[in-house]
Swiss-Prot record:
InterPro entries: OligopepF_N_dom, OligoPept_F_C, Pept_M3A_M3B, Pept_M3A_M3B_dom, Peptidase_M3B
Cofactor note: Binds 1 zinc ion.
GO biological process: peptide metabolic process; proteolysis
Record: active site: 382
GO terms of molecular function: metal ion binding; metalloendopeptidase activity
Alphabetized UniProt keyword annotations: Hydrolase, Metal-binding, Metalloprotease, Protease, Zinc
Entry binding sites for Zn(2+): 381, 385, 388
A Pfam cross-reference name: Peptidase_M3
Name listed for the protein in its UniProt record: Oligoendopeptidase F homolog
GO cellular component, one term: cytosol
Lineage: Bacteria, Pseudomonadati, Spirochaetota, Spirochaetia, Spirochaetales
Known EC number: 3.4.24.-
Family, similarity comment: Belongs to the peptidase M3B family.
Cofactor(s) required, per the database record: Zn(2+)
Length: 590
């Protein structure tokens, strides 16, 4: 693998949009230090309108500058973790962020202590219109903020909140060793690769060896996740929420019906998913599918070759349906302004991401390979995130630009759908068509159905804890096994180790997070349907949604596009698309 200094400059992202040189960066660091010290002087002063305005402006100035230097440091480090200078810069930023947090921490509680009618009157002043929504969101939290002493007690316990997840990570990623299969290491990250092996014996060996280690540690792992669930319930009750579910949906003002509608509608339509596994069983020519058979590819030996530039052209051509404004900006970013850090080098972070900050550009990290069509889809996916960030930044003040995780996957999934449609229209090779269509189906299973199953599991266990019902290891595994059988259907035979999968899902340590993947694809496919069918204002309203950023709550933003996630029809649309794609691929395999 080549070193960072061997990568062509044109293949690296251009961070000069953040800082032209190191001198400018150091100057901003010093300015933040000075502003942070000055901010301390406001702590003891009683708020009036002028002081409130001044303090608010200073606070967001500091936060904007801090975001800028932090992104610069993070982006430098992600391209080469072995670089001493990058590590030093990152360390400086971490320390600075801690200092800023400690010094400014008094400010939001101070706002909440001030008479709410006063604050409401102040934020209605035209001079504060660019901060109004952010403050209204803070005021909404007021009834869940405790006394100063109680808040201090909870704050002191904050490091312990993540301790269960930290122990889980250390145990599963460091202490648990899975050995080798055919001289290749079996790890948490390579496990899925083994399940994609054509040889069922290798898949079975990987499955049994992997989950036997989880079996050996099942009591510890079960206690960790149960304790984490109970910790979240304690925090929720302490903050005057009914339960963890209510607390987690509160900050984004998500209607509980969004969650329950997702699970109920998917459950009503599970025969469609069961049908897919029956189809997979027939293609693999097996009497039964086993848990280790669900990831093996149904096509093989298919080679796509696209240079980065070729991939960009295909993506841009496909996205012309979103209008000239969208493609012109994206073309400039991908091919001229160097938003993308393209290729792998020693010390570079694996995978891909989009990182948009209010200043600079919405950068994209890739490890692009010409022979991987997956990498072309990854580029389209991350470009969706970056364009969402671009439009959000250009159309909102700093306090309102950050959109929620709930909305984040919509733009990226829409890009993938549009690209796939374009490739299928222009492809004549049956095997390549098979591959693209199967990839679409696999992605829908992993993003929509699987995440809904996880969401249902979480909901059941958290509800039991909320009702103070006993939850033990067997509660987890029995609940999960029932869900596996329900979602996968009669075509699959499960091993007694299968339900231990519930003990290895890191996202369960972030309560009620995974459902957002499923609602994200449901919203995206609903918007995509309107665009594909040339519905009036579909594209215009979608771009309006992207430009909304964090200026509205997620469901209100989505309302611009006509998407309502509380309605069965929105979820059924996703299931119907899955059903159509399954019928299409069945015909190709006949």
């Amino acid at each position: 693998m080549i070193n960072r200094n061997e990568i062509n400059e044109n293949d690296k992202w251009d961070l000069s949009f953040l800082f032209a040189n190191e001198e400018e960066y150091v100057k901003t660091i010093n300015a933040i230090e000075i502003k942070t010290k000055e901010f301390k002087k406001y702590e003891k002063l009683e708020l009036n309108f002028d002081l409130f305005k001044e303090t608010l402006n200073k606070y967001y100035e500091i936060m904007e500058d801090l975001e800028k230097v932090s992104y610069y440091a993070m982006l430098q480090l992600e391209t080469d973790v072995t670089n001493k200078d990058s590590n030093k810069i990152y360390s400086i930023c971490v320390n600075l962020a801690t200092k800023v947090s400690n010094t400014t921490s008094y400010f939001m509680p101070k706002i909440l202590k001030t008479d709410e009618k006063k604050i409401q009157a102040w934020i209605n002043d035209p001079e504060l219109k660019d901060k109004k929504i952010a403050i209204e969101k803070i005021l909404r939290e007021k009834k869940h903020i405790l006394s100063e002493q109680e808040e201090k007690i909870l704050a002191n316990y904050t490091p312990l909140y993540t301790s269960y997840q930290s122990i889980f990570s250390a145990l599963t990623n460091a202490d648990m060793e899975f050995g080798e299969i055919n001289k290749h290491p079996l790890t948490n990250s390579t496990y899925t690769l083994f399940l994609q092996n054509e040889d069922q014996k290798i898949r079975k060996e990987a499955f049994l060896r992997f989950y036997q280690k989880y079996k050996n540690n099942e009591n510890t792992l079960a206690n960790l996740i149960i304790s984490d669930f109970k910790k979240n319930h304690f925090i929720a009750k302490t903050r005057r929420f009914q339960n963890t579910f209510s607390m987690q949906l509160f900050s984004n003002n998500i209607d509980k019906k969004v969650y329950t509608n997702l699970i109920e509608t998917v459950n009503e339509n599970l025969p469609v998913l069961n049908d897919y596994y029956e189809f997979r069983k027939k293609v693999l020519n097996q009497e039964y599918l086993y848990h280790y058979d669900v990831y093996v590819p149904l096509t093989k030996g298919i080679i796509f070759k696209n240079s980065f530039e070729d991939a960009c052209e295909k993506i841009l051509k496909s996205l012309e349906v979103l209008g000239n404004e969208y493609t012109k900006i994206l073309r400039n970013g991908l091919l001229k302004e160097r938003w993308v850090d393209k290729y792998e080098n020693t010390g570079k972070r694996s995978g891909a991401f989009s990182a948009g900050s209010y200043n600079g550009k919405p950068y994209i990290l890739l490890n692009y390979k010409d022979e991987s069509i997956r990498d072309m889809f990854t580029l389209a996916h991350e470009a969706g995130h970056s364009m969402h960030s671009y439009f959000s930044i250009k159309n909102n003040p700093f306090p309102h630009y950050n959109y929620s995780i709930f909305e984040a996957e919509i733009a990226s999934i829409i890009n993938e759908q549009i690209l796939a449609e374009y490739l299928l229209k222009n492809e004549t090779d049956t095997n390549k068509i098979k591959y693209i269509k199967l990839t679409q189906i696999d992605d829908m299973i992993s993003t929509f159905f699987r995440q809904t199953m996880f969401a249902e599991f979480e909901y059941i266990i958290h509800e039991m804890i909320s009702k103070e019902e006993p939850v033990v290891k067997e509660t987890l595994t029995e609940t999960y096994m029932n869900l596996l059988k329900k979602y996968f259907g009669p075509s699959l035979k499960f091993d007694e180790l299968s339900p231990l999968e519930c003990l290895r899902i890191p996202h369960f340590y972030s309560p009620f997070y995974v459902y957002q993947y499923a609602t994200g694809i449901a919203a995206a496919l609903s918007i995509y349907k309107g665009i594909k069918e040339n519905k009036k204002d579909a594209v215009e309203n979608y771009i309006k949604f992207l430009k909304t950023g964090g200026s509205k709550y997620p469901l209100d933003s989505l309302n611009i596009t006509g998407v309502d996630l509380t309605k069965k029809a929105t979820i059924e649309n996703t299931i119907n698309i899955f059903k159509c794609r399954l019928e299409e691929i069945k015909k190709i395999f006949q």
